[in-house]
Amino acid sequence: MTLRFPRFSQGLAQDPTTRRIWFGIATAHDFESHDDITEERLYQNIFASHFGQLAIIFLWTSGNLFHVAWQGNFESWIQDPLHVRPIAHAIWDPHFGQPAVEAFTRGGAIGPVNIAYSGVYQWWYTIGLRTNGDLYTGALFLLLLSAISLIASWLHLQPKWKPSVSWFKNAESRLNHHLSGLFGVSSLAWTGHLVHVAIPGSRGEYVRWNNFLEVLPYPQGLGPLFMGQWNLYAQNPDSSNHLFGTSQGAGTAILTLLGGFHPQTQSLWLTDIAHHHLAIAFLFLVAGHMYRTNFGIGHSIKDLLEAHIPPGGRLGRGHKGLYDTINNSLHFQLGLALASLGVITSLVAQHMYSLPAYAFIAQDFTTQAALYTHHQYIAGFIMTGAFAHGAIFFIRDYNPEQNEDNVLARMLDHKEAITSHLSWASLFLGFHTLGLYVHNDVMLAFGTPEKQILIEPIFAQWIQSAHGKTSYGFDVLLSSTNSPAFNAGRSIWLPGWLNAINENSNSLFLTIGPGDFLVHHAIALGLHTTTLILVKGALDARGSKLMPDKKDFGYSFPCDGPGRGGTCDISAWDAFYLAVFWMLNTIGWVTFYWHWKHITLWQGNVSQFNESSTYLMGWLRDYLWLNSSQLINGYNPFGMNSLSVWAWMFLFGHLVWATGFMFLISWRGYWQELIETLAWAHERTPLANLIRWKDKPVALSIVQARLVGLVHFSVGYIFTYAAFLIASTSGKFG
């Protein structure tokens, strides 16, 4: 018999229907379920695939550098970052007529180009790159790293180089290596790059390999380090009239604590950033020496966890048994990693706009909007994935005997209390927030806007005041000149910080009012509901009231209606599926809020947001409808313009999104009948009946159809909003 796809499952390979193809694709990466898999091969396959992942990342970033160097305008952008539009790459399209060629020829290019809204120009400029030659060098270096990663991937699948299971389960060594070796050393290396290359570059000094050893990053070199006079490195910082990239107004300090932003670039001081990375490096280098390995010093994580027993005996056995549970479950480890990474990605979104690290990126409004939205969506998908793998852990890896009465077992014992509290919080937030919005809508509709219920977010304003924002008049902590906190930081970072937080042109601690209060609670509703669905799905994954133990049922059985006893309540896969809709919904509200608030800030009409955001019609009319005018005008009676591609994508995104419903609201029997009718017609049509297929066509399973629907819904939703965001922002600000 010839070997058919999928090779990893003989059972599936012999399936006579098209199910073989779909199930093969669905389980291709589920190594645990493959024929002849052993624990050792499982770990080795995943380890090797990590190097493949790195190779793809390096290749992709190399491509970014290469295309900007080849087709971009990096060198002319550097001369005037605020007015030259950065080019991502050229467009080669044989369908372009003269109007299209003219519309897309911009940024000083000779032909049609795409504008870069990714912030790479600002990033590369900040870290000291200055010429196309630098970009080509970077591209080649990353290409080399990509090749090395691929070789490493292949090498670690060869018999001599395959690591053993015990090597993979040596948690202490891995933690030490990752903390010290990856985070610590790389942060130290990055500090070195900033001090030796980026900071001199920002002061007009071009440091490369040929003069790297001759140019002192600091006049006295390492003298102050060895003499213990570290404060010298902070003396004589760049002045407030420093022109970035030149020696005008430049200082000599390399590690500072100035606080606030560089007045010209509106980004954090490079010397502050270098100082931050040095501190991070120190912390992680220390942290990476905490755990006991071959040398017999440091802590054993197992001993630490076993000792974590709550006193008094009423809270169970604490962390007993957790070490082996986590160390033997890849899904548990992946869940923890995804949860951490998801939070970090969302924090990146928040901090990239409020504390911009890259020169001039704060004045590139479209890039700011694109980066915020991008990182929030990525965070949403990663965080839902954390709970999916948490659920799979309970089904495949959880052993009740090993975890008796510890925190995991007790969490399962209390799951009704956990889910009911989350449910109550979600209902409370939902009804109250919607009630306020709808009340305000009705008042506006009846012409009595003064009867709206408008609530000032006084607690949030108090927190902002504590951080130094003076406009609310709270006079507390950093906003009070008499407080000890104020006096403690007055001589170092505080003046710069206070200047930044009270400056109305940046995004640091934006002024908030009743509209913010409402949308904050709408977002809280979305977050709590998403969390409720995900937490319930994970906690009920192994067993719930209807089905006490689902271990043999697996993860992805469908919610199948009342016909089979009602499995809607108890499918972990279905909880994940539902949660993704809520996640997208929530991030929609988050990005709408961020974007509208910033558009009004950038245009200087914040009163529009303040007045229109307190009722739903305001959001629909003054944010969505008003800002979609650019998309509707991509093609108009005067021809086309550079927004037409976004207008097209806006329509296309809606189409993909709507197609999702064809799969989501459907009955499987209908599809099966339709397929068989089509197959019957095909077989009875001359010429067409010459083509036969080996697999009998069958309708998608319930879970598959849901997945296909969810993918269309998600992709369409994101495409639609991406087009709206970029067109409405770039149409206003260029």
UniProtKB/Swiss-Prot annotation:
Cofactor note: P700 is a chlorophyll a/chlorophyll a' dimer, A0 is one or more chlorophyll a, A1 is one or both phylloquinones and FX is a shared 4Fe-4S iron-sulfur center.
GTP-binding found in the keyword field: no
UniProt-annotated binding residues for chlorophyll a B1: H654
A Gene Ontology biological process term: photosynthesis
Species assigned in the record: Phalaenopsis aphrodite subsp. formosana (Moth orchid)
Gene Ontology molecular function: any one: magnesium ion binding
Keywords tagged on the record: 4Fe-4S, Chlorophyll, Chloroplast, Chromophore, Electron transport, Iron, Iron-sulfur, Magnesium, Membrane, Metal-binding, Oxidoreductase, Photosynthesis, Photosystem I, Plastid, Thylakoid, Transmembrane, Transmembrane helix, Transport
Reaction(s) catalysed (UniProt annotation): reduced [plastocyanin] + hnu + oxidized [2Fe-2S]-[ferredoxin] = oxidized [plastocyanin] + reduced [2Fe-2S]-[ferredoxin]
Biological role: PsaA and PsaB bind P700, the primary electron donor of photosystem I (PSI), as well as the electron acceptors A0, A1 and FX. PSI is a plastocyanin-ferredoxin oxidoreductase, converting photonic excitation into a charge separation, which transfers an electron from the donor P700 chlorophyll pair to the spectroscopically characterized acceptors A0, A1, FX, FA and FB in turn. Oxidized P700 is reduced on the lumenal side of the thylakoid membrane by plastocyanin.
Subunit field text: The PsaA/B heterodimer binds the P700 chlorophyll special pair and subsequent electron acceptors. PSI consists of a core antenna complex that captures photons, and an electron transfer chain that converts photonic excitation into a charge separation. The eukaryotic PSI reaction center is composed of at least 11 subunits.
Location in or out of the cell: Plastid, Chloroplast thylakoid membrane
Superkingdom: Eukaryota
Chain's gene name: psaB
Matching InterPro entries: PSI_PsaA/B, PSI_PsaA/B_CS, PSI_PsaA/B_sf, PSI_PsaB
UniProt: phylloquinone binding residues: W671
Record membrane topology: Multi-pass membrane protein
Spans traversing the lipid bilayer: 46-69, 135-158, 175-199, 273-291, 330-353, 369-395, 417-439, 517-535, 575-596, 643-665, 707-727
Identification of the protein by name: Photosystem I P700 chlorophyll a apoprotein A2
EC number of this enzyme: 1.97.1.12
